[in-house]
Regions:
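Ligand-site clamp/hinge motif
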Residues: 199-202, 231-277, 292
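Extracytoplasmic/peripheral linker and loop segments enriched in polar/acidic and small residues
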Residues: 90, 163, 328, 411-427, ...
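Surface-exposed binding/hinge segments that line
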Residues: 90, 100, 117, 126-194
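N-terminal lobe/hinge region of extracytoplasmic solute-binding protein
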Residues: 42-93, 207-209
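Structural transition elements
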Residues: 337-374, 390-396
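Gly/Pro-rich hinge or "lid" segments in bacterial periplasmic/extracellular proteins
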Residues: 173-239, 243
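Long beta-strand-rich cores associated with HINT superfamily self-processing modules
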Residues: 516-541
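Ligand/substrate-recognition segments at binding pockets and active sites
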Residues: 347, 371-444, 486
Length: 541
């Protein structure tokens, strides 16, 4: 998915524009010793209003993860797919599945969670008229092409592969065999929706109603979102606190300063500038652990200047002009690891992690120059790197990457294009505004190698922002998805990855650890494998 997120009077003076979120008494953690206080956490405004099939970035995903529960949920420690609302998945051929639900689940408005709640939600998410970003996640369900054709109008209102049997069961027919399909259903696009969503969509978007451990109390764009524990939640992961106030910051250094000042309880992205001091500042309240996150630079393959024949040499050459070892050591203080493929070491070798990029991900200025010259040179003789700079210390590494490229290829070759906010950055990506490589931080939707490859590089995929297209790559992904043996499937996915190494539609930069820091007000703070705080388990002291 789609990214990454003192005296009191001093902090207030610094953050006067954020006074409502950083300095007011409203939202005080107010712990009473029973863990039921409010957690004050840093956050960034999502690109769009949060809804399951239309949110594919990290900030909105954090909210969905608190207010929804789906068929499957990933264990916060291991990433293992575990049934949540699903009682069972039955199949004899890995293509036709019968899904049985547990009884007793409800939405926070009192509506029951039924088979229809899932089928209606998935049909809505898939239909072309609804313009949902995550529609391609439903593309392997039979009938998808009728509700979401490659061109023209829909031929049907619903997918033929989805059939409600009764309140607690429905059947799913896929277009091809996909043995791991149930394991993908922990992604938030597959969440159920109440009838209220369809009765008054605008009202629902203004205050989403879900079936998770939290409800949304209020949201002020640019300031904060208040979520409160739902007393009626009967799931196994009931909130251990009274709620979470997600406070908007456009600079994570400011968030860190507020944490140290006692005006904030949790930051889930420690800025690079603070890494040298974070252990002395926070001690054992600093978390640094591997996560299912990779940072890349995506080429705008929609621009023929970058996608023309021979330009793969230029793209590979730029990759070899980046000194990942120095950047990760000097800037990120061991919270990043130089990338050697397009997945994550958190998958492990059994999960498909392997050095596939090879020499193309190693710093070699001479070879970089040679390849770029052989490929016809950089378009216009220069390259501009774009990224949002409101979170994640992005401006610091952008400058470092450009300095590396300039040192390797000659001064003035590389410049940076900092974008003020994540929302604006994503909007410009969607409008295909960039004429040079742009940052893509991918946080896996589920812990499978497939999720690092298909959503990002498959033709027409939901997060294929650079519009890369390769029939050979697509065919290998299709082949992998149809394998019933996981080991054989992984081999096919790795063969598809080799196409990425040849074509370099995106430069792998580094794997990102999950990092967080928290105040003395909190306990039981942890990050899941996706580097997102396990908010429902946090206690306020």
């Amino acid at each position: 998915m789609r990214g990454a997120t003192h005296a009191k009077w001093v902090a207030c003076a610094v953050t006067v524009a954020l006074a409502a979120s950083a300095c007011g008494d409203d939202g005080d953690s107010g712990g009473s010793g029973d863990g039921a206080g409010i957690v004050r956490s840093s956050w960034g405004d999502p690109q769009s209003p949060v809804e399951p099939a239309n949110t594919n970035e990290v900030q909105g995903g954090k909210v969905l993860d608190m207010i929804f529960r789906g068929l499957v949920r990933y264990d916060p420690e291991t990433g293992e797919a575990q049934n949540m609302i699903a009682e069972d998945f039955e199949t004899t051929d890995s293509q036709k599945f019968t899904v049985t639900l547990k009884d007793g689940w409800t939405f926070s408005n009192g509506e029951k969670v039924t088979a229809e709640s899932f089928v209606d939600a998935w049909n809505y998410g898939a239909h072309i008229d609804n313009n949902q970003k995550n529609a391609p996640f439903f593309s392997n369900i039979k009938g998808y092409e009728d509700v979401h054709p490659a061109s023209g109008e829909a031929k049907a209102e619903t997918m033929s592969g989805l059939v409600v049997k009764d309140d607690l069961s429905f059947t799913v027919e896929l277009t091809d065999k996909f043995s791991l399909w149930p394991d993908t259903l922990g992604y938030q696009a597959f969440s159920p929706l109440p009838q209220a969503f369809f009765d008054d969509h605008d009202a629902w978007l203004s205050k989403p109603v879900g079936n998770g451990p939290y409800t949304i109390e209020s949201y002020t764009k640019g300031s904060e979102m208040k979520l409160r524990a739902w007393d009626g939640y009967e799931g196994p992961d009931k909130a251990q606190n009274g709620g979470v106030d997600l406070k908007v910051y456009t600079d994570n250094n400011t968030a860190y300063t507020d944490l140290i000042a006692g005006n904030l309880d949790l930051v889930d992205d420690v800025p690079a500038q603070q890494l040298r001091n974070v252990e002395s500042d926070l001690g054992d309240r600093y978390i640094n652990q591997p996560a299912l996150i990779i940072q890349t630079l995506v080429f705008p393959m929609y621009d023929e200047k970058w996608s023309a024949d021979g330009m793969e040499k230029v793209r590979r050459g730029l990759s070899m002009a980046i000194n990942r070892d120095v950047i990760t050591k000097e800037i990120f203080q061991e919270t990043r690891t130089p990338a050697v493929d397009w997945t994550s070491p958190a998958l492990g070798e059994k999960g498909g992690y392997k050095d596939i990029c090879g020499d193309a991900c190693k710093f070699d200025p001479d070879e970089a120059k040679k390849l770029i010259e052989e490929g016809g040179g950089l378009p216009g003789g220069k390259v501009t790197i774009s990224s949002n700079v409101d979170t994640g210390s992005h401006r610091v590494w952008m400058d470092a990457v450009c300095n590396s490229i300039n040192n390797a290829l000659g001064g003035g070759t590389c410049t940076v294009n900092p974008i003020g906010t994540f929302a604006d950055f994503r909007n410009q990506i969607g409008a295909e505004k960039f004429t040079g490589p742009f940052r893509a931080g991918w946080q896996a939707d589920y812990p499978l190698i497939q999720n690092f490859l298909q959503p990002l590089y498959y033709t027409g995929a939901s997060s294929n922002d650079g519009k890369f297209s390769s029939k050979e790559f697509d065919d290998l992904v299709d082949k992998a998805n149809q394998e019933t043996d996981p080991g054989t499937a992984i081999e096919s996915f790795q063969q598809a990855e080799e196409i990425l190494a040849e074509q370099m539609p995106a430069i792998p930069l580094w794997y990102q650890n999950g990092s967080a820091g928290y105040s003395e007000n909190l306990s039981d703070v942890s990050l899941n494998q996706f580097s997102v705080p396990v908010y429902d388990q946090i206690k306020v002291n």
